[in-house]
Amino acid sequence: MSLRPCFVSLIDESDKPILIYVPNEAENEMNDVLKYNVLSNISLDYFESALVEWHSLDSKPLLKSIFQLEGVSVFAMLIKQTGLKIVIGFEQKSLSGADDEFEAINQIFETVRKIYIRVKCNPLLVSGDEKSIIKSLERKFDELFISTEVEL
């Protein structure tokens, strides 16, 4: 079974979106793209909520299922050291609730986090040039989510 995200959002420590990536954006309806932007915005409330515990005893970031809305299950991870927020949505009908599924979702988050770190720390990119960082992130996400499917 393949697991493919509907969207991937990277949000900085000041709650400014770095990138809201939608695989095959040209093929998606504009309403879907707008829906994913709204879901990313809604997720910010969960990061600020006192009801959601974002840290654990170990230093590993916690992955949380934060809400389901409009047929999309939204998961999030907060990297405390940098304030980076990663939000990824999956179609609810593609999720089975199997035990290994959460581990596969966690692996997708780790891959996204590593891609972000590699792009951000790339010495060939000018650190203040956000457009080149975004283009590089989009290209890497296209390679990950469009050219191959993530297998469970």
From Swiss-Prot:
Give the CC-aspect GO terms. cytoplasm; cytosol; Golgi apparatus; nucleus; TRAPP complex; TRAPPII protein complex
Question: Where, per UniProt, does this protein localize?
Answer: Golgi apparatus, trans-Golgi network
Chief localisation class: Golgi
Task: Give the superkingdom in one word.
Answer: Eukaryota
Does this UniProt record's set of keywords contain Amino-acid biosynthesis?
no
Query: Keywords assigned by UniProt?
Result: Golgi apparatus
- Biological process annotations from GO: early endosome to Golgi transport; endoplasmic reticulum to Golgi vesicle-mediated transport; intra-Golgi vesicle-mediated transport; protein-containing complex assembly; retrograde transport, endosome to Golgi
Keyword Protein transport listed: no
Please name the InterPro entries in this protein's record: Longin-like_dom_sf (IPR011012), Sedlin (IPR006722)
* Record's subunit section: Interacts with the TRAPP II complex; TRAPP II subunits TRS33 and TRS65 are required for this interaction.
User: Which family does the UniProt entry place this protein in?
Assistant: Belongs to the TRAPP small subunits family. Sedlin subfamily.
Instruction: State the remark under miscellaneous.
Output: Present with 8660 molecules/cell in log phase SD medium.
Q: What does the function comment of this entry state?
A: Required, together with the TRAPP II subunit TRS33, for TRAPP II complex assembly or stability, and for proper Golgi localization of TRAPP and the Rab GTPase YPT31.
Q: What is this protein called?
A: TRAPP-associated protein TCA17
Q: Which organism is it from?
A: Saccharomyces cerevisiae (strain ATCC 204508 / S288c) (Baker's yeast)
**Phylogenetic classification of the source organism:** Eukaryota, Fungi, Dikarya, Ascomycota, Saccharomycotina
What gene codes for this chain? TCA17
